[in-house]
Amino acid sequence: MDTISTFARRVGLTPSALRFYDDCGVLRPAHVDPDSGYRYYSADQERDAALLRALRQAEVPLADITAVLAGDPASAREVLTAHARRLRSRADTAHAAVEAALRMVEQPSHGEVS
């Protein structure tokens, strides 16, 4: 078992992030010392921590991450496919807005002398 600091370094998360994920019920430590309250993580949790980090980078909501980590591969795929669809939609909307702004910038202003 690793201390929270050792585990955090190994998986690329901060100890405060691991505490937050524990408090939210997303990634619980393998063991919490009843006297000190220290959290300990097992090597078996590295995959879930790495997946959690990747999903947060993809802006997946915590509720969806919890479902992915707790669910079977088919339901995880469903959750992630839905998230990818939402991301594509937001990207399309943002792209259209930038294109419209570019067209406005490229048009001469009213009253401008050319």
Region annotations inferred by a language model:
Residues L69-V113:
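Short, charged amphipathic alpha-helical surface segments
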Residues I65:
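Hydrophobic positions on the alpha-helical face of helix-turn-helix-like DNA-binding modules
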